[in-house]
Every structure is written in structure tokens, then in C-alpha cells.
Amino acid sequence: MGAGGLIHTWAGMGRSVTVLSVTDGEAELPARENLDRIRREELKEALRKLCATHVSVVRLGIPDGRVAEFQNKLRSAILSLIEPAMTMIAPYERDGHPDHDVVGSVCCEIARSRDIPLARYPIWTWQRADPTEFREVSWGKFPLDSEARRAKIHALQCFVSRLRPDRRERTVPRHMLNYFERSYEAFLL
């Protein structure tokens, strides 16, 4: 959601892109059978819509909601993916979702210690943000051309298990999608 346009653009430029899928979000709707498999398929289809089928996807299989318990595994996985001249894109470390916060914090720690450029994307921050939280924060905008924006919107629609308007268990409110359908992506730098 947070960096789909960037993935589309970088993949289209032939840049090496690796997506680290930390969890499958399977605990979000515990009554839903095979949610982990469904979410993996949704990610695969979303990457196809982004024209990023050659993007590497590394799955950690950490249980949803329990990333804090597996920080060493997460750290090791991230360290194993470091390449020269890379840029790291990660969830904002104060996003308000426990798994996003841990992933973002570990990425910040690694980026600082290895001098890797890091941009962090907000997801749940848009829902709950207090503007005073960002007074001292540098923001960057990654502009999306019409093709990248269209690809991102189509990719977002692949996450049916999170977005279907006819389901009681919908997890991402419709109004939140407005933040991800803009002509740019916002990153904390």
C-alpha cells in the first residue's frame, strides 16, 4: 500500500527490488480459514498488477501480530538482503500497528548502523496521526506518473481480504484508501 508506485517505477527502470514479506496477516481475521494463503496470493497478484513480476519476494513466515518476538530473525533476514548502493523502504516505526512498528524500528536501526538511505511509509498513521507528531520530521514525495498511479490503484484492489466493501470483516476503511490513491507517495525521510 505504501510503496506500490515506487515499486512499479523502480521495477520498470530495471532496478533490483526485493519485497520482504514479514507476516501474511493471518491473525487479522482469525475465523477466516487459509487467510495466510489468500494473502500470499493477493501479494503475488498485486505485484503482477505493478508489472513487477520479476521482483524478488522473501517470505519470513513470522506469525502475524508477533513480530516483536522474532526480532532476531527479522534483523538477520534484513542484514542478509543488504546490497551495495541500496535504498531501504520500510513501514514508519510509529505507524500504530505493532508489527509495522517493530519492522520500522529494526530497519531504522540497521539503516543507521550501515549508513543506508531509508524512507519510511505510513499506513495506519493516516488514520490516527496527530499533526504535532510530525513537526520535526522531514517528508518526501515520490511523484507517480499516470501509469504508476493506475498500476498502484489496480494493485490495491488485489487485496480483497482487506478491502471488500461487502464484508463485515473489512480491515482497511474505504476513506483510508484515499491516501494510497494519490498522485504521489509520501515518505518520512
Describe each PLM feature range.
Residues M1-R120, H154, C158:
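Active-site beta-strand->loop->alpha-helix modules in alpha/beta enzyme cores, enriched
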Residues E42, A46-L50, H54, S80-L81, ...:
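The feature marks non-catalytic terminal segments
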